[in-house]
């Protein structure tokens, strides 16, 4: 679309494994393929817990500020995240302030005024979902410190030159959450990179071999976080057995694989995995097996009916999507949810909760089922696929066609490039709150002092 190659810097807090990370990686790869220069700046990047493109040299990644703590005695996560981002951005301002045409910022908007004030680049902020709606306020101190943080999120997000969101659902929640932001967010649906999903299954990979089974696979892919409601899939699966919804010999021929991002540094990941395992074994009497990335390769026992796969790799994902008879997507009010799109492209029918983003991606009774978040209702839906009330193969084919027409990476990259070109040539908006500028100046001074002391 343009002969000019843009220099684009992506700023992302923690470049691990998750839907937000998948989106920014795909965005970076897509823009890079169109001839633009791309680099990632992040506060944390673990080569053993990341997407392949950030590890194999496809994308340049620089880590800054990882020496700062992620929490203070297990608390104040958001404040530490903001401080880490300030340090990262301070280093950019000190040494690379004129290196980029566009900053693509997502998840955390605290750095936007700093970039706005001290660089000449335009800022595109991608809102996966308002952070103020994702946090719990269980204590008085949490309520007290979240109040200014929430206001800061609204003010700093509004300073962006362009705001994009991942769905119509998120756009609606954005307008309700940030009434002072008059800019209308543009909807940019997350894509999937078809090339990454068209790879053949590598059955010689040891991490794939341990997953091989004669059982039929029901698959759930979600981070091990309580808000993802993974137990919905587990309870629905167990109900098939407990309520005799299918014959015992039929149930014995199925395995539920609960796969997802898992970080041993995150207490909730550790605790939630333990809770799910206890629920499966102690309440439902199901045989389980857990696979960690660091654990030695060992075949899953043949009688294991629930397998927990923590932080799977690309080869394992390819295998599981190839083997799965049904994909179970459990979160409610999910802002978008890339997993159902991945499943549909792999020709796997999807069961998802009938709220949030999946309502915009899954076609009910055509590419899968949209159901209330009720284990018994989900169990009935799973049973209906097992007894072939629904034609899973046909639904899978329809799902693949649907994704090919609406969620391709080239279409996403074209749209994103057009937004960036328009943004780069636009006249900067200098209007802003003086209080926010003051916050930006103080933040930069504070970050620079810390950074210089550390050096």
Curated annotation (Swiss-Prot):
GO biological process, one term: protein glycosylation
One GO cellular component term noted in the UniProt record for this chain: endoplasmic reticulum membrane
Residues carrying sugar: 138
Keyword Protein biosynthesis: no
SUPFAM superfamilies in UniProt: UDP-Glycosyltransferase/glycogen phosphorylase
Protein topology in the membrane: Multi-pass membrane protein
Molecular function terms, GO-annotated: GDP-Man:Man1GlcNAc2-PP-Dol alpha-1,3-mannosyltransferase activity; GDP-Man:Man2GlcNAc2-PP-dolichol alpha-1,6-mannosyltransferase activity
UniProt keyword terms in alphabetical order: Endoplasmic reticulum, Glycoprotein, Glycosyltransferase, Membrane, Transferase, Transmembrane, Transmembrane helix
Pathway annotation from the record: Protein modification; protein glycosylation
Regions crossing the membrane: 73-95, 434-453
Effect of residue 368 to R: Temperature-sensitive phenotype
Catalytic function, reaction form: a beta-D-Man-(1->4)-beta-D-GlcNAc-(1->4)-alpha-D-GlcNAc-diphospho-di-trans,poly-cis-dolichol + GDP-alpha-D-mannose = an alpha-D-Man-(1->3)-beta-D-Man-(1->4)-beta-D-GlcNAc-(1->4)-alpha-D-GlcNAc-diphospho-di-trans,poly-cis-dolichol + GDP + H(+); an alpha-D-Man-(1->3)-beta-D-Man-(1->4)-beta-D-GlcNAc-(1->4)-alpha-D-GlcNAc-diphospho-di-trans,poly-cis-dolichol + GDP-alpha-D-mannose = an alpha-D-Man-(1->3)-[alpha-D-Man-(1->6)]-beta-D-Man-(1->4)-beta-D-GlcNAc-(1->4)-alpha-D-GlcNAc-diphospho-di-trans,poly-cis-dolichol + GDP + H(+)
Source species, domain of life: Eukaryota
Function: Mannosylates Man(2)GlcNAc(2)-dolichol diphosphate and Man(1)GlcNAc(2)-dolichol diphosphate to form Man(3)GlcNAc(2)-dolichol diphosphate.
Family: Belongs to the glycosyltransferase group 1 family. Glycosyltransferase 4 subfamily.
Protein name (record): Alpha-1,3/1,6-mannosyltransferase ALG2
Gene expressing this chain: ALG2
């Amino acid at each position: 679309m343009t002969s000019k190659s843009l220099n684009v810097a992506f700023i992302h807090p923690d470049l691990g494994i998750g839907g937000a990370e998948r989106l920014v990686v795909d965005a970076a790869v897509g823009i890079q393929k169109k001839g633009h220069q791309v680099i990632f700046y992040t506060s944390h990047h673990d080569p053993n817990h990341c997407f392949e493109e950030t590890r194999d040299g496809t994308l340049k990644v620089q880590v800054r500020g990882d020496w700062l703590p992620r929490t203070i005695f297990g608390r104040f996560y958001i404040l530490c995240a903001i401080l880490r981002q300030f340090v990262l951005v301070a280093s950019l301002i000190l040494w690379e302030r004129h290196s980029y045409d566009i900053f693509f910022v997502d998840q955390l908007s605290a750095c936007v005024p700093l970039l706005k004030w001290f660089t000449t680049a335009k800022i595109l902020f991608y809102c996966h979902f308002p952070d103020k709606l994702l946090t719990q306020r269980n204590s008085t101190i949490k309520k007290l410190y979240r109040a200014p943080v929430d206001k800061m999120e609204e003010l700093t997000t509004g300073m962006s030159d362009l705001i994009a969101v991942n769905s119509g659902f998120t756009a609606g929640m954005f307008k309700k959450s940030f009434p002072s932001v008059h800019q209308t967010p543009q909807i940019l649906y997350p894509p999937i990179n078809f090339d990454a999903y068209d790879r053949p299954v590598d059955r010689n990979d040891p991490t794939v071999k341990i997953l091989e089974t004669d059982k039929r696979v029901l698959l759930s892919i979600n981070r091990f976080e309580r808000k993802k409601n993974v137990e919905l899939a587990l309870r629905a699966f167990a109900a098939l057995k407990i309520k005799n919804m299918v014959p015992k010999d039929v149930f014995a021929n199925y395995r539920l694989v609960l796969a997802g991002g898992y970080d041993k540094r995150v207490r909730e990941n550790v605790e939630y995995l333990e809770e799910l395992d206890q629920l499966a074994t102690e309440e439902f009497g199901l045989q389980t097996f857990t696979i960690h990335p660091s654990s030695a390769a060992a075949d899953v026992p043949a009688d294991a009916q629930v397998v927990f796969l923590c932080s799977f790799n690309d080869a394992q994902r390819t295998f599981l999507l190839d083997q799965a008879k049904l994909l179970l997507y459990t979160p409610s009010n999910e802002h978008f949810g890339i997993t159902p799109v991945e499943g549909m492209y792999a020709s796997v029918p999807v069961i998802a909760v009938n709220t949030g983003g999946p309502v915009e991606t899954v076609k009910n009774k055509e590419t899968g089922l949209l159901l209330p978040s009720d284990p018994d209702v989900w169990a009935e839906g799973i049973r209906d696929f097992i007894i072939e009330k629904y034609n899973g193969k046909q639904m899978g084919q329809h799902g693949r066609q649907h994704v090919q027409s609406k969620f391709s990476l080239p279409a996403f990259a074209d749209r994103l490039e057009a937004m960036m070109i328009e943004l780069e040539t636009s006249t900067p908006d200098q209007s802003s709150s003086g209080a926010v500028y003051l916050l930006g100046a103080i933040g930069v001074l504070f970050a620079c002092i810390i950074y210089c002391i550390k050096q």
